[in-house]
């Protein structure tokens, strides 16, 4: 039985909406949820369809800093294998940069390849996106948070940056490939 394309699309969007709702309701009863998964960038047409008011905080970091950070981890943990025949640390710096930036299965390559799409969607849905340079966030976190709260339409909460509580649950960031 072939379904009408519009009915199928409406059903699919509702399926996604209910799945996401159930996912986050199982984790928290808080009215606002931040998901830091980079994977959302690959599904913006879907997420904007099931929640046209969804918000996307995009924090951009200087690419040079990211590469230096990745490379310092490589030298700190040379035993970690990266999908190649030659140990990754033995590749030239230029070859490593190419791998970091072009490998769409890597921590950097995948979000980097999605960045033009994210910026295009952010232009089209400018009220849904807040783009912030990580350097600005690091230098003036209080001001950055004030702008974020204002963008969200939420009352500002004064953060104590010297006493950040542990989260309610442990999130093992290393499980995220992208």
What do the PLM-derived regions correspond to, one by one?
Residues 161-166:
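Acidic/histidine-enriched alpha-helical segments
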